[in-house]
Amino acid sequence: MKIIFAGTPDFAAKHLEIILQSKHEVLSVLTQPDRESGRGKKINLSPVKQTALDNDIHVYQPESLKIEGVFDKLKNTDPDLILVVAYGLLVPKDILELPKFGCVNIHASLLPRWRGASPMEHAIMSGDNNIGISYMLSLIHI
C-alpha cells in the first residue's frame, strides 16, 4: 500500500517507524514546520521529520494544507491511504478525498473525552483508569 504519513511528535514517529518496517511504501511525510525551542531558541527537527530523513523519505512542512500547490504535490504521489497521527493541522476535504482507501486518523486517547492536544497528559493528570488509542476513518460531513 502507498501511504502518505502526517504527524509531528515522538508518538507519531513511533507509528512511522512501524510502517517503515512493513511491506508498505511511505511516499512522503507531512510534518509541522521546524520551530525554535528551548532556552537557546535552537531550531529542532520534529521526531517525524528526523525519522523520515533517516529513511530517505521526502518531507513536506507546509504552514497549512490549504496553501496553493500542496494538494497538487500530494495528488501526484497517487496515495492509497493517508495516515494522520498527532499532526496538528486540519486536513481539508480535497486532501481527505485523495487516497483510494481514505484517510485514517490515530488519536492518543479514547475519544471523545480527550479530543484535542495532549490527550495522554490530560488523561493521566485527571487520574483516568481507562486509557487507550482511537483509530478512525476521517470522513467529510455535508
Where are these regions (language model features)?
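One-carbon transfer enzymes
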Residues: 1-140
